[in-house]
């Protein structure tokens, strides 16, 4: 596929910056997003580290650094610097705005997932290894389950 899959790196960065500045926002964000909804690997592992810190009771530069080191992240300094950069670049810390940033990230994640599922279905239809009914059922299941991050084709 030559086209880039849907993503909004600014929204991802805004979500991370918001949670880093106010860890109480993690619950708001976690109700919408999963770690795998982030497009960039750096964003995914920072979100994972934020989650671990929040669940441990404190998210700050010291606990984040320790969590990144504990999880074996070789680019700990880059992760810390990026978290601070994301916090400084945050357009708004209002709960409604942060919720909207999270929804944008989720929307892009669902779109990526559906595009990949449809491409998989197109491949199955081309090579005729599955019946049309099986592929159609798989597509319908993928669409129904895409927002929950579950489901697959046939």
Task: Pin down the residues of each PLM region.
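Phosphate-handling catalytic cores of nucleic-acid transaction enzymes
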Residues: 148-154
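Charged, low-complexity surface segments at secondary-structure and domain boundaries
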Residues: 1, 50-52, 121-128, 151
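Noncatalytic partner-interaction/assembly domains of nucleic-acid and motor enzyme complexes
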Residues: 1-110
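A general boundary/transition motif marking the beginning of the first structured unit of a protein
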Residues: 3, 7, 17, 127, ...
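Extended, charged alpha-helical coiled-coil/arm scaffolds that mediate oligomerization and mechanical coupling
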Residues: 80-142, 148
């Amino acid at each position: 596929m030559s086209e880039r899959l849907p993503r909004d790196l600014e929204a991802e960065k805004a979500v991370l910056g918001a949670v880093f500045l106010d860890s109480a926002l993690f619950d708001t964000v976690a109700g919408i997003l999963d770690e795998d909804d982030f497009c960039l690997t750096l964003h995914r592992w920072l979100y994972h580290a934020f989650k671990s810190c929040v669940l441990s009771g404190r998210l700050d530069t010291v606990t984040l650094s320790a969590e990144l080191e504990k999880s074996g992240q070789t680019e700990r300094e880059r992760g810390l610097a990026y978290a601070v950069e994301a916090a400084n670049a945050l357009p708004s810390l209002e709960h409604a705005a942060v919720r909207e940033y999270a929804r944008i990230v989720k929307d892009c994640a669902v779109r990526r997932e559906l595009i990949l599922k449809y491409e998989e279905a197109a491949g199955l239809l081309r090579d005729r290894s599955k019946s049309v009914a099986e592929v159609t059922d798989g597509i319908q299941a993928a669409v129904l389950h895409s927002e929950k991050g579950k489901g697959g084709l046939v």
